[in-house]
């Protein structure tokens, strides 16, 4: 039976305010009962000065009052331990509600939320484990920051999915959980950046052409053609392999593999939606060429999917690699959001691939990702998400959109200034598709627009054709995020690269300092020095010049 009840609570902002007020009352009681000391108060204020909502941060952090404040690892660990059961409760609420809902899109949104809560809980548990077992090394410091940033992204994504088509009852059911979890995720990030500042040597050295997080074996694989790779599993439509479909192959991949599992997909068009779940780790999906091995689907928001669930291929198992494959969503521009590839796997490499769709083509959802030597086509927001992601040597190709639409290559989704996420486009080429080029004066295209308040995107050392409007960037909604975003351009070329007519927003920057540009390179934005080298993909750690 479809659930359709009147509003039980006020709208989201009202709910958010009530939670904050309630937490403040509790925190005041805690301070009185524990004899809150001046040093504790000072540290709490220092931490919460880093948060976008100081009052809610102070309320949250009062939970760990009385601990040895000098033991920074234990303070953050204790706070995260108190967060875990709350994430579990949100998971149970979403999962239980999904069983009682008849509306397919609402059910999908709730199942998305359940998956996202499960992923968040795993990351929080992993973070607690690091804090419990070891002093922070350069690598574990990087991991913690990336994972805690991803937890916040998961919570926001759940809320976004509910906004796409859920009833007020379903939104109300989940909002109280999600608003608190978002506040907690922001607070954990504030604790982290205050108590564990990045060390000056946080970027590990690069050996040879590869960051150290890419194993020697993976380096060899990424430099090898698919036909020359010795696979563990072969998928072939003609029956000559181990399986005829990708989904059969995914089911056969061992869970939580410590070694690389290679799945070779032979030439053919595979019409299926494929999900590499959290336990499908260290998978390498390799085809026989981006024009020969094609995985295609057509899920879309208009026909009842959520943006998150519309992906033709989704991967959330860490260490995912894809090479020599085309990922496609054929829904068309009239179907609006329709994702070809969604990645929520840490330390992902996408090499020599083609990714084709229209709106929301590629969804680098969260964590560290690297894309090299690939073609991506789309219309509106066709690279969107909140990963720490670098694109190198890629072709980014706006295509002909529907009348009344404007092409935007990026829509970056950073929601908190303490998240270490952002999109970097380096040494790429931006030009119109064959169908757009004759009419590009009629259909405008831009480098990006700010999806979320702290959106962060840099285009550097790239070729920009005249397909890009002289303004360069587009507003999302009037003056939303124009002061808090960070959009930058550095040493680009081509007829569309001139900056004299660019937007005059406070958050837009023409970068002249190499030191600033370096922050958006492989070595710094995605800590490539600690993991990319082992994958074998070619990359440039710093600036090209």
From Swiss-Prot:
CDD domains named among the record's database cross-references: PMEI-like_4
Q: Mind telling me which PROSITE patterns this protein's record contains?
A: PECTINESTERASE_2
Q: Say which domain of life the source belongs to.
A: Eukaryota
Q: Which cysteines are joined by disulfide bonds?
A: 326-353, 394-428
Binding sites annotated in the UniProt record for substrate: 307, 337, 449, 451
List of catalytic residues = 360 (proton donor), 381 (nucleophile)
Instruction: Provide the leader sequence positions.
Output: 1-37
- Which GO-annotated molecular functions does the record name? enzyme inhibitor activity; pectinesterase activity
Protein name (database record): Pectinesterase/pectinesterase inhibitor
């Amino acid at each position: 039976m479809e659930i359709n009840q009147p509003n039980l609570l006020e709208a989201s902002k009202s709910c958010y305010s009530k939670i904050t007020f309630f937490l403040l009352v509790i925190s005041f009681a805690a301070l009185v009962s524990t004899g809150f000391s001046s040093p504790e108060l000072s540290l709490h204020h220092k931490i919460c000065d880093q948060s976008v909502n100081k009052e809610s941060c102070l309320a949250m952090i009062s939970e760990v009052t009385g601990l040895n404040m000098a033991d920074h690892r234990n303070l953050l660990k204790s706070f995260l331990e108190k967060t875990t059961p709350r994430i579990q409760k949100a998971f149970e609420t979403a999962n239980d509600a999904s069983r009682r809902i008849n509306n397919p899109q609402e059910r999908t949104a709730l199942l998305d939320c359940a998956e996202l809560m499960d992923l968040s809980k795993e990351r929080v548990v992993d973070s607690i484990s690091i804090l419990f077992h070891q002093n922070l090394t350069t690598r574990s410091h990087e991991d913690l920051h990336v994972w805690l940033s991803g937890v916040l992204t998961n919570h926001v994504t759940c809320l976004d999915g509910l906004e796409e088509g859920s009833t007020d009852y379903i939104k109300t059911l989940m909002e109280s959980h999600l608003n608190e979890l978002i506040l907690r995720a922001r607070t954990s990030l504030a604790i982290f950046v205050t108590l564990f500042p990045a060390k000056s040597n946080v970027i590990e050295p690069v050996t040879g052409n590869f960051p150290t997080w890419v194993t020697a074996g993976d380096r060899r694989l990424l430099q090898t053609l698919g036909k020359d790779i010795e696979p563990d599993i072969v998928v072939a439509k003609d029956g000559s392999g181990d399986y005829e479909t990708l989904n059969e192959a995914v089911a056969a991949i061992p869970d939580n593999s410590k070694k690389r599992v290679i799945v070779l997909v032979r030439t053919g068009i595979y019409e299926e939606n494929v999900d590499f779940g959290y336990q499908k780790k260290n998978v390498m999906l390799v085809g026989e060429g981006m024009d020969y091995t094609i995985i295609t689907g057509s899920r879309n928001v208009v026909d009842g999917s959520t943006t998150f669930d519309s992906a033709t291929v989704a991967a959330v198992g860490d260490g995912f690699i894809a090479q020599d494959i085309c990922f496609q969503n054929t829904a068309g521009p009239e179907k609006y959001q329709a994702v070809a590839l969604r990645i929520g796997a840490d330390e992902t490499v996408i090499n020599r691939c083609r990714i084709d769709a229209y709106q929301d083509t590629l969804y680098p959802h969260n964590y560290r990702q690297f894309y090299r030597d690939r073609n991506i086509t789309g219309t509106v927001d066709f690279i969107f998400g909140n990963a720490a992601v670098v694109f190198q040597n890629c072709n980014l190709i706006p295509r002909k959109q529907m009348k009344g639409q404007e092409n935007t290559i990026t829509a970056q989704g950073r929601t908190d200034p303490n998240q270490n996420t952002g999109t970097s486009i380096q040494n790429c080429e931006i030009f119109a598709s064959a169908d757009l080029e004759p009419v590009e004066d009629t259909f405008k295209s831009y480098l990006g627009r700010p999806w979320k308040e702290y959106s962060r995107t840099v285009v550097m050392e790239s070729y920009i054709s005249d397909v890009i409007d002289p303004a360069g960037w587009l507003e999302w909604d009037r003056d939303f995020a124009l002061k808090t975003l960070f959009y930058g351009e550095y040493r680009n070329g081509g007829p569309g690269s001139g900056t004299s007519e660019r937007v005059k927003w406070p958050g837009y920057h023409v970068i002249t300092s190499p030191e600033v540009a370096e922050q958006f390179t492989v070595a710094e934005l995605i800590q490539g020095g600690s993991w990319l080298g082992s994958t074998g993909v070619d990359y440039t750690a710093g600036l090209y010049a």
